[in-house]
């Protein structure tokens, strides 16, 4: 797609409001006030505070997810199906976090990195988001099959999980293609550029399509899969009094719960905004202002998710802590007496290695 040219752009097709009031945009702008000529009272968010948050999230994610990958790869001889999924999840979170410094820099001076980097960073962030939620759905199906429908052929999944992960990454690459094609630097006022979908005169229609795509395949469908699988998994665990396996599932449940707490608010607000843009909900200036503020706040909450999984593993995952301490003891960073005092975590006994996780 060529360079964005203001003289060929009908600004009334993109916005119907006063552009000078638009002082803040997210890294992936989704809230441009294009529905009614409203004057926001306070849409501006302290951009430097957002920069600090993004930098901290990036650092925590780099350290935490790198340690997760190290522990899993160090114990790859005993790596379970779930561990492979969690390894890919850590990779996705790591790459997601690597894009945050660029979005943080764009908070202060707008997008100054050109069209190519706009496409690349937007695409990487979109692919990693899709892959994260799809991998979580795969984990839920794996636990459902392992516990609710345990069979003698379950061990074969160890050889299939790599292909499942590759398929999820390829699906994420395909689902994110519209972002790669349409993202370009777009002017929102005389001096500020944002990295956003350049869809010309078809703004409203294509924007709704670009909203429905990630909301449906990147959140709603995986969410329904997770609710179904974990609902039946929990019922089976409680009915069979499988307390040991239930304790082993705590990390997985915590990972899914944190994902929902981080991304559900944003997706609910985004869904409400989509209904408003399609005129299914009456739009007023007050509602537009509330939606814009909510989208800004909940998007930041969603970005925090990329650094939280390693924290969950550290506090809940006994095997992760032991695995990390074992690596540190190998290189003399902690004493072997301290490692012995911590004790080796008991593994869940099973006819299949699929029901045990390193974390």
Curated annotation (Swiss-Prot):
Residues 1-47, 105-119, 183-207, 273-293 are extracellular. Its main location: membrane. Residues 75-83, 142-162, 231-250, 315-359 are cytoplasmic. It is a multi-pass membrane protein. Glycans are attached at residue 23. GO terms for molecular function: chemokine receptor activity; interleukin-8 binding; interleukin-8 receptor activity. Disulfide bonds join 118-195. It is found in: Cell membrane. Coiled coil: none annotated. The chain crosses the membrane at residues 48-74, 84-104, 120-141, 163-182, 208-230, 251-272, 294-314. One of its GO terms (biological process) is phospholipase C-activating G protein-coupled receptor signaling pathway. GO terms for cellular component: cell surface; mast cell granule; mitotic spindle; nucleoplasm; plasma membrane. Belongs to the G-protein coupled receptor 1 family. Receptor for interleukin-8 which is a powerful neutrophil chemotactic factor. Binding of IL-8 to the receptor causes activation of neutrophils. This response is mediated via a G-protein that activates a phosphatidylinositol-calcium second messenger system. Binds to IL-8 with high affinity. Also binds with high affinity to CXCL3, GRO/MGSA and NAP-2. This is C-X-C chemokine receptor type 2.
């Amino acid at each position: 797609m060529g360079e964005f040219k203001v003289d060929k752009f009908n600004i009334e097709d993109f916005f119907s409001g006063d552009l000078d009031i638009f002082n803040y945009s997210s890294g992936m702008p989704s809230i441009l006030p294009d529905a009614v000529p409203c004057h926001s009272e306070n849409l501006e968010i302290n951009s430097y505070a957002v920069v600090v948050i993004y930098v901290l999230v990036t650092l925590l994610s780099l350290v935490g997810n790198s340690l997760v990958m190290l522990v899993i790869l160090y114990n790859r001889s005993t790596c379970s199906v779930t561990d492979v999924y969690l390894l890919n999840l850590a990779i996705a979170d790591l790459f997601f976090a690597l894009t945050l410094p660029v979005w943080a820099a764009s908070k202060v001076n707008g997008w100054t990195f050109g069209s190519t980097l706009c496409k690349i960073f937007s695409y990487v962030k979109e692919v990693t988001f899709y892959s994260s939620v799809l991998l979580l759905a795969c984990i839920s199906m794996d636990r459902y099959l392992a516990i609710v429908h345990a069979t003698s052929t379950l061990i074969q999944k160890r050889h299939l999980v790599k292909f499942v992960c590759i398929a999820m990454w390829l699906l994420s690459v395909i689902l994110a293609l519209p972002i790669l094609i349409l993202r370009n630097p777009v002017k929102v006022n005389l001096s500020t550029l944002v990295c956003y979908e350049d869809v010309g005169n078809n703004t409203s229609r294509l924007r709704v399509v670009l909203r429905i795509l990630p909301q449906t395949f990147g959140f709603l469908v995986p969410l329904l899969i997770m609710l179904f699988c974990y609902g039946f998994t929990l019922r089976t665990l409680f009915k069979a009094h499988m307390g040991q396996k239930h304790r082993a599932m705590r990390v997985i449940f915590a990972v899914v719960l944190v994902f929902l707490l981080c991304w559900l608010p944003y997706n609910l607000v985004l869904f409400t905004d989509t209904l408003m843009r399609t005129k299914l909900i009456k739009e007023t200036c007050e509602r537009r202002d509330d939606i814009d503020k909510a989208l800004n706040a909940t998007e930041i909450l969603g970005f925090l998710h990329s650094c939280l999984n390693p924290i969950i593993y550290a506090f809940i995952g006994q095997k992760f802590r032991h695995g990390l301490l074992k690596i540190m003891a190998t290189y003399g960073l902690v004493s072997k007496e301290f490692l012995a005092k911590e004790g080796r975590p008991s593994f869940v006994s099973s006819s299949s290695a699929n029901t045990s996780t390193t974390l």
